[in-house]
Amino acid sequence: MAGIRIAISGVGNCASSLIQGLEYYKKISHSDNLVPGLMHNSLGGYLISDIKPVAAFDIDMRKVGTDLSKAIFSEPNCTKKFSDVPDLGVEVMKGQVLDGVAPHMTDYFRVDEKQKPVDVAAILKRTKADILINYLPVGSEEAVKYYASQALEAGCAFINCIPVFIASNKQWADKFRKARLPIIGDDIKSLVGATIVHRALTQMIVERGAKIDSTYQLNIGGNTDFRNMTDQARLKSKKISKTESVASQIPYDAYVYAGPNGCIDCLNDNKICHLKIDFKLFGDVPAYIDLKLSVEDSPNSAGVVVDAIRVAKIALDRKLGGPIIPASAYFMKHPPEQIHDAVAREKLEEFIKGTVQ
């Protein structure tokens, strides 16, 4: 079975955790033994060790021109190091800046205008990349569309991990469908993150016959993702993605708020979520759930992306194009179609086995 050749746009904390994870889990076999952090040891016959980075793009002068193994630990990245990564022989290349750097982030993302952007599609073709994984900052509307277009031009599948709506946008979905290239998106759900926990609790309350009156989810962190989202203009799509992901699980009108709420530098890549759900029980007796969740944000994301990569490769092998609905529904906050998580998981397993497309 051929390997999976991946390219990455945006070598930030999430990319760091993904690349570290490829090294950390490289000896995991086809065994069914539980491995912490993995939903599938083997997925469609593909192991973590089959995933090979072949190209990477960034705009920060501290990363451009360096080997990917070093760039993932360069500032402003601040996620935990859990694996040593050997030299990968993959040079980080300068991508197009476009709207990828918000005005308030110029001290955090350092652009050297003397470094010239490369032809991304040409690099993807030259390196024979199968899949382009998008990790650009939230709010990078034009930059994300640019990379999506480069994936199309190069004949790559596209995994969109941020809330710029590509897979869930009909025009873009049709472009990938017409090109017979798979896309999984939009906006990654973490393994055990705020959104998946919030969805699980709302699903349970609804199914048990209680009535949700209101619910909110507050999140703080200290990485560049949270710093970037202190600009309300960059935050719009993220709030839509998170709020709709939760609201879609409640089959009636209820007040729902979910979104990032501030950056505290000392937290680094630690994200702290506080969520509350007010609901009524038998006899309209009120009750509430008040919960705190603390996670290292980027490894939590990478645990899902390693499966999204393998599903995208299966879709490529089957010559499927357009949004892969079961994967998008299970892995992403803002898929083209919202599906109950338990149902989405069943459909995903059927897709992996090849019983549904």
Descriptions of predicted regions:
Residues 3-5, 184-187, 291-296:
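A short glycine/serine-rich beta->alpha loop
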Residues 9, 49, 63, 71-77, ...:
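Active-site-lining helix/loop region of Rossmann-like oxidoreductase modules
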Residues 132-134, 158-161, 184-187, 214-215:
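Short catalytic-loop micro-motif centered on adjacent basic/acidic residues
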Residues 137-153, 161-182:
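Rossmann-fold NAD(P)-binding glycine/threonine-rich loop
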Residues 175-188, 209, 213:
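Rossmann-fold dehydrogenase core element
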Residues 303-357:
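NAD(P)-dependent Rossmann-like dehydrogenase/reductase catalytic/cofactor-binding core
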